[in-house]
A protein has these predicted regions:
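Acidic, His- and aromatic-enriched active-site or binding-groove loops in soluble protein domains
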Residues: 107-122, 167-175, 203-229
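Aromatic-lined carbohydrate-recognition surfaces of secreted/lumenal glycan-active proteins
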Residues: 178-196, 207-213
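Functionally critical loop-and-helix segments that line ligand-binding/catalytic clefts
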Residues: 29-50, 201-250
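Substrate-binding cleft of extracellular glycoside hydrolase catalytic domains
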Residues: 31-169
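Secretory targeting and sorting signals
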Residues: 1-28
Length: 250
């Protein structure tokens, strides 16, 4: 993942609250406060691997849908306690059922979502982003991550006129991850970017924040452990060290 330079909506399928709680508990136990790890993706293809107690590997190639990390299998297999992150976004073109974007299955599921037809279409976009990312990760042998993370950044496409479309998209991703690949789900962003993309609109099912600090100082990054953006606890703060995105566990 490039560092920062580079409530409640209905869930489409019925989730077991006990199962979701178990996934969250398992995810929380996977990380030890004070430990450090890293995140890598397609920009690190062919390069050396950093060391750390855990790693978070990118599934996509910077954008949702048609771009994927060609080195996912190798990076995931070389990563201790590997988690996965997916790129996210919303654009009207993503609502097309064209074999690349929204899936017919997600569009069908979206009919159960309370909201306008545009909201349902946005939820289906998120559902499809998650489904296609899960399918690609599974095809690359990355099928049991310790947690899933949504990369929510302004560098990708989002609606600037109706933030609820972004909200429904993100909710669709979270709902689908919890249903198809049960594990803790968190969000990578900054307070500014999260506010720009979803404002104060709620997203349910998110367990934790992963904060991009843009800092090269571990000390300054650690000082932001109490400053999240979604209202959830901060699990990780990211900073740049020795050419790699490094993550400190709060």
């Amino acid at each position: 993942m490039n560092h920062w330079l580079r409530r409640l909506l209905p869930i489409a399928a019925v989730l077991s609250s006990a199962g979701a709680l178990m996934a969250n508990q398992v995810g929380a136990m996977a990380y030890t406060s004070g430990s450090t790890g890293y995140d890598i993706s397609y920009p690190q293809c062919g390069g050396p691997y950093p060391s750390g107690g855990f790693g978070i590997v990118g599934v996509n190639g910077g954008y949702p849908f048609v771009y994927y990390n060609p080195c996912l299998n190798d990076q995931y297999s070389h990563t201790t306690n590997a988690a996965l992150y997916i790129n996210t976004g919303y654009d009207p073109s993503y609502t097309q059922v064209d074999g690349k974007h929204s899936t017919a299955e997600c569009v069908t599921q979206s009919a159960t979502i309370t909201g306008s037809s545009a909201h349902q279409a946005a939820w289906a976009v998120g559902c499809s982003e998650a489904s296609r990312s899960i399918a690609y990760a599974t095809s690359q042998g990355a099928s049991s991550p310790s947690s899933w993370w949504l990369d929510v950044e302004t560098g990708n496409s989002w609606s600037s006129t109706d933030l609820s479309l972004n909200q429904y998209t993100i909710q669709g991703i979270v709902d689908t991850l919890l249903r198809q690949a049960p594990a803790a789900v968190g969000v990578y962003s900054t307070a500014y970017q999260w506010r720009t993309i979803v404002g104060n609109l709620p997203v349910s099912g998110v367990l934790a924040d992963w904060v991009a600090t843009g800092s090269t100082s571990a000390g300054r990054a650690r000082a932001t452990c109490g400053t999240g953006f979604s209202g959830r606890p901060v699990w990780f703060v990211q900073y740049l060290h020795a050419g790699f995105d490094t993550n400190y566990t709060c």
